[in-house]
Amino acid sequence: MSRYRGPRFKKIRRLGALPGLTNKKPRTGSDLRNQSRSGKKSQYRIRLEEKQKLRFHYGLTERQLLKYVRIARKAKGSTGQVLLQLLEMRLDNILFRLGMASTIPAARQLVNHRHILVNGRIVDIPSYRCKPRDIITAKDEQKSRALIQISLDSSPHEELPNHLTLHPFQYKGLVNQIIDSKWVGLKINELLVVEYYSRQT
């Protein structure tokens, strides 16, 4: 299944706020109206919707998300927590959380178009897994910095998660550590996602 490129508001109206996909928010009460129309949800549908939230927020294909679930299952610790850490440490998500891109699709475009350096080298793979002490900077070109400046100027200036540090005037971000689960940028029940995939991994 390919990456979703359809109307974004349609998705947030059904699944709730997905800040990685779009900075728009569903209208107040729309979730309640949707629930009342659809009646009681089955357990399968509840798990499916949590999985869809994760997939659309991080901008993943079905195959990519399944791959991350399989990696998380083999790692030590809670599968759900490891899964969220893997997704949060992707380069496209780190750029988004730093405010250097307005959404994860916008961050992916920056990376694909070779505007981003990691530790002084161009990285053009959005799924690149960032590590503690990684230094993320804009390429030293006017166009690259201008694109990031637009995002920095329009970002809501929310508190940065404690695993990241931003130096906006240098167009630079630092990865201090692996993210703590309480700083994940999405309201999600990751256990339901793991349960959804339990028969496929």
Curated annotation (Swiss-Prot):
Write down the species: Atropa belladonna (Belladonna)
Q: What InterPro entries does the entry give?
A: Ribosomal_uS4 (IPR022801), Ribosomal_uS4_bac-type (IPR005709), Ribosomal_uS4_CS (IPR018079), Ribosomal_uS4_N (IPR001912), S4_RNA-bd (IPR002942), S4_RNA-bd_sf (IPR036986)
Q: Name one Pfam family in it.
A: S4
Q: Which PANTHER family match?
A: 30S 40S RIBOSOMAL PROTEIN, SMALL RIBOSOMAL SUBUNIT PROTEIN US4M
Please provide, in alphabetical order, the Gene Ontology terms of the cellular component aspect for this entry. Answer: chloroplast; small ribosomal subunit
**A biological process term (GO) from this entry:** translation
The text of the family note is: Belongs to the universal ribosomal protein uS4 family.
Question: Do the record's keywords include S-adenosyl-L-methionine?
Answer: no
Top-level taxon of the source organism? Eukaryota
Q: Could you tell me where this protein is found in the cell? A: Plastid, Chloroplast
- Function noted in UniProt: One of the primary rRNA binding proteins, it binds directly to 16S rRNA where it nucleates assembly of the body of the 30S subunit. With S5 and S12 plays an important role in translational accuracy.
Listed PROSITE patterns: RIBOSOMAL_S4, S4
Name any one GO molecular function: structural constituent of ribosome
Q: What is this protein called?
A: Small ribosomal subunit protein uS4c
Renumbered to this chain, region (Disordered) spans 17-44
Subunit structure of this entry? Part of the 30S ribosomal subunit. Contacts protein S5. The interaction surface between S4 and S5 is involved in control of translational fidelity.
Give the SMART domains listed for this entry. Ribosomal_S4, S4
Q: Which UniProt keywords apply?
A: Chloroplast, Plastid, Ribonucleoprotein, Ribosomal protein, RNA-binding, rRNA-binding
